[in-house]
Amino acid sequence: MRNRIRLALIPVAVAAIALAGCSKTDKADPNLPEAATLLSESAATTKTQTSTHIVLKVTGDKPTLKLSDLTGDLTTKPAVAAKGTAKTGGLELPFVVVDGELFAQLGSAYSSMGPVKDVYDVGLILDPNKGLANLLANITGAKSEKTETIDGVDSVLVTGTMSKDALNTFTGGTTLTADIPAKAWIQKDGNHALTKISVDTSPGNTIEMSLSDWGKPVTVDKPAQ
């Protein structure tokens, strides 16, 4: 009889443990800032920025950009300019963007690769209406998940769904037909600067961008040829 009772209680115990686990996981941290407010304030901050350091990673077997990795500095004042290292077509090359033209170091010298827009218009990243600020403004169903440290900055992870139109505009190359899962890491205190953003364009395919040194002066010289 005791064995029967014990066997009967096992499913009940398992269910109770499962429910307890779910309750703990689903419970929001009351100390985290409200997600919608974080997104709104971060979007407002990002909209005013004119320079940043970028680490971009594109993963998956269906690339949404013509490059897979990029590390560099970007400014939009007095004009769009950038410098760093990018990986495209299996090659990792130092690059410079000046006056709308892309230069890549092939060997010991830089060569013109033509208009930067033919690869990716880097100016879109900080465009007040089409760039990161617009991505943040177009995340819905947002939830503050937890605090993580991104490049030494305490950041709140916000999850939600991003508008397909916002990302299509941002990348200049994707043709998404449905909204997609998105994550944004936003500085917990201060002006709520964006520290990282990630979107899943399709299963197994992700665009992730980490950002730092907001507002730091960036000087880019046109390379000699």
Swiss-Prot record:
The keyword Cell inner membrane applies. It is found in: Cell inner membrane. GO terms for molecular function: lipid binding. InterPro entries: LolA/LolB/LppX, LppX/LprAFG. Disruption phenotype: A double lprG-mfs deletion strain is more sensitive to the antibiotics tetracyline, vancomycin, rifabutin, clofazimine, novobiocin and ofloxacin. Modified by Lgt on Cys-22 with an S-linked diacylglyceral, signal peptide is removed by LspA, Cys-22 is further modifed with a fatty acid on its amino group by Lnt yielding a triacylated protein. CDD domains: LppX-like (cd16334). Residues 1-21 form the signal peptide. A lipid is attached at C22 (N-palmitoyl cysteine). Keywords: Antibiotic resistance, Cell inner membrane, Cell membrane, Lipid transport, Lipid-binding, Lipoprotein, Membrane, Palmitate, Signal, Transport. GO terms for biological process: lipid transport; response to antibiotic. It comes from the Bacteria. Induction: Part of the lrpG-MAB_2807 operon. Its main location: membrane. Gene3D superfamilies: 2.50.20.20. Forms a U-shaped beta-half-barrel with a small hydrophobic cavity able to hold a triacylated lipid or triacylglyceride. A flexible lid region may move to accommodate different TAG molecules. Belongs to the LppX/LprAFG lipoprotein family. This is Lipoarabinomannan carrier protein LprG. It comes from Mycobacteroides abscessus (strain ATCC 19977 / DSM 44196 / CCUG 20993 / CIP 104536 / JCM 13569 / NCTC 13031 / TMC 1543 / L948) (Mycobacterium abscessus). The lineage of its organism: Bacteria, Bacillati, Actinomycetota, Actinomycetes, Mycobacteriales. The gene is lprG.
